[in-house]
Regions:
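Short catalytic micro-motifs in class I SAM-dependent methyltransferases
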Residues: 103-104
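Class I SAM-dependent methyltransferase SAM/SAH-binding core
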Residues: 33-37, 41-90
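Conserved catalytic/acceptor-binding region of the Class I
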Residues: 112, 119, 123, 127-198
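A conserved beta-strand element that flanks and buttresses the S-adenosyl-L-methionine
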Residues: 100
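Local beta-strand N-terminus motif with an aromatic residue
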Residues: 31, 96-97
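Conserved class I S-adenosyl-L-methionine
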Residues: 1-35, 43-47, 66-69, 73, ...
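Core SAM-dependent methyltransferase catalytic element
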Residues: 181, 254-264
Length: 264
């Protein structure tokens, strides 16, 4: 699956805000190594480097397109290391002080196994910090499921539909509490005010083109893509009516998990 960094970065500030909120909950002062799981274009990794200038920042992502942007933005520097790998396969060579993941783990199933595995990477006194979209019940994703399941698209796109792997915040507390010294898990719903899209595309469609729509658009050719987007846009326009000035209110729910490992 190919990602479009430019499309994703159209709403860079809105996508960055949850990462900043997550980072604010980490009291650790001078970690030696910080792993950014699902680092994407490197926006968050650069903020991690600014927060901890003495740390080695290791960005992991399975998108070559995203990593190319990340590498270009930090060329000439020595603080960052970029690794092209799948989160399901990659393992650090040694325990890590901070494992940070912003808007990536919702693409992976079996969170009971996944979270147990990545918390196992955390060094004594270290922290795991995760933020994940929890948007499957929102109108944007309900509309997507309805279009994909329609007679026109279900044979080709239906197999790509996934059940949300993201559980309620309390589930992650229960999952990690036995191994962690402290677990802090919560849910936040952001109300984004999206500006009118410059190309006339509904703002919520423009947003989801950078994320949730990507797997579906990847298997369609140009003409089919436009037909699919038209079907999706028709539903989204009803679900998210524009304000008089063309802006759109877009509620977005996210789950946060911070777990600390005790010092030995």
């Amino acid at each position: 699956m190919s990602w479009d960094p430019a499309q994703y970065l159209k709403y860079a500030s809105e996508r960055l805000r949850p990462a900043l909120d997550l980072l604010a909950r980490l009291p650790i002062e001078a970690p030696q190594t910080v792993v950014d799981l699902g680092c994407g274009t490197g926006n968050v990794a650069k903020i991690l480097a600014a927060r901890w200038p003495g740390a080695r920042i290791v960005g992991i992502d399975n998108s070559a397109e995203m990593l190319a942007v990340a590498k270009a933005s930090t060329s000439g520097g020595t603080q960052h290391e970029w690794i092209h790998a799948d989160l399901a396969d990659w393992v650090p060579k040694e325990p890590v002080a901070v494992v940070f993941s912003n808007a990536a783990l919702h693409w992976h199933d079996d969170h009971a196994t996944l979270f147990t595995r990545i918390f196992g990477w955390v060094a004594p006194g270290g922290m795991l910090a995760v933020q994940m979209p929890d948007q499957y019940a929102a109108p944007s994703h309900v509309a997507l499921a309805a279009v994909v399941s329609s007679e026109r698209w279900r044979d080709q796109l239906g197999p790509l539909l996934r059940r949300s792997p993201v559980a309620p915040a309390a589930s992650y507390f229960r999952l990690l509490a036995a191994e962690a010294a402290v677990v802090d898990a919560w849910t936040t719903e952001y109300l984004h005010v999206l500006p009118p899209a410059e190309d006339g595309v509904h703002p919520v469609v423009a947003w989801t083109k950078g994320t949730a729509l990507t797997p579906f658009l990847a298997v369609l050719d140009g003409e089919a893509q436009q037909a699919f987007l038209a079907d999706y846009s028709a539903r989204v326009t009803i679900a998210y009516p524009a304000l008089p000035d063309g802006r759109v209110l877009f509620a977005f729910r996210r789950v946060f998990v911070v777990a600390s490992r005790a010092m030995r």
